Each structure stands twice: as C-alpha cells, then as structure tokens.
C-alpha cells in the first residue's frame, strides 16, 4: 500500500517530515502547479486540513515522548484491560466546574477547561488537536482508569457537527 499511514490507528509526524503519495516534482509536471513538500505533506497540512495525522512532534525525542504517553493509556493487547494508576481524589468535589459552563445556552465556553476539571490531575491527551476543532477527542483518566473523551467544542461552530468533526469522532 503506497499510503498505508492513513490506515494506521495513530500517526505522530515530526515538524521536519513530509507524508504524501506523489511528490512536488510530479505535481509540477502533471499540473504545472508549484507546491513545496511542506505544503503538500507537512504536518500542518495533515493536522489542519486532511486530518491524517494525530499528533505533531517538534522532533524525534518529542515523538517518542508522545508515543510513550499514548501507550500509557492503552492495554498491551486486546485481552488485557487498560493500565490502572493511582487516581486524583480532587475530582470528587470540584465546585469550579459549575462556573465553567454558562447558564445561557447561547454563550460559548472552552470544553477543554471542563475536561481538565473532571479528569485526574487535569491531564488530557488530545488527539488531532488541530483538526475539526468543533469536536475534542482524546484520552484521560478518571479515578485512575483510562477513558476516551468525545466532546463538542462550543467555541467553534457552536459545537455543531460537520463532516470533518463527525469523521474525527467516528475514527476515534
């Protein structure tokens, strides 16, 4: 498969990497359009526009750190449960949560703040943070157990689902 990365569960792309099927030279020869490798297959193109990648790493060391963090939420195989760790007791009573969501339904708020107020230690690994910003997906822990979170983001399109957001949520 020429473009097998699109079929994988998670892709971490470094800032220096490009990912494409047909390079800039072929595009120029076939269409006459001049495009750089970065424009065609750089991390911003795939995070912001195509949604192919899930994480952008600044360099290889950051990519390894992101991979370790992601794997810390997942079981070793399909027969095991996700790892359980010591939970954060502060989530049992967080009065600040009530103030985060406005009483006026037409008023926006950042759902990431609500997520941070609910999950252990405020730690949330957002997946595809730059793609389909009207929905937020990712991994966290509540009382030490791994959870997947899918949340509409009221700050973008009032949290309404469009094609990209629906795709992002379904793939997650």
Q: Could you say what each language-model-derived stretch is?
A:
Residues 23-24, 44-51, 89-97, 148-152:
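Short acidic (Asp/Glu) and glycine-rich catalytic loops that position anionic groups and cofactors
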Residues 7-13, 101-109, 138-142:
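Short low-complexity stretches enriched in small and charged residues
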Residues 23, 36-42, 90-93, 102, ...:
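Alpha-helix initiation/capping motif
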Residues 1-79:
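Conserved catalytic cores of soluble enzyme domains
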């Amino acid at each position: 498969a020429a473009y097998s990365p699109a079929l994988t569960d998670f892709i971490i792309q470094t800032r220096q990497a490009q990912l494409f099927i047909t390079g800039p030279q072929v595009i120029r020869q076939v269409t006459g359009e001049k495009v750089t490798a970065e424009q065609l297959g750089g991390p911003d193109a795939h995070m912001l526009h195509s949604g192919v990648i899930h994480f952008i790493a600044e360099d290889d060391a950051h990519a390894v750190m992101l991979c370790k963090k992601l794997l810390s939420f997942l079981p070793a195989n399909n027969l095991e449960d996700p790892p359980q760790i010591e939970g954060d007791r502060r989530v049992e009573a967080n009065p600040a949560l009530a103030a985060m969501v406005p009483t006026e339904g037409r008023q926006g708020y950042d759902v990431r703040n609500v997520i941070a107020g609910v999950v252990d230690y405020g730690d949330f690994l957002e997946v595809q943070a730059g793609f389909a910003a009207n929905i937020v997906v990712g991994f966290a822990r509540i009382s030490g157990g791994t959870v997947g979170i899918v949340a509409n983001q009221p700050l973008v399109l009032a949290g309404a689902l469009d094609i990209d957001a629906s795709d992002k949520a379904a793939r997650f």
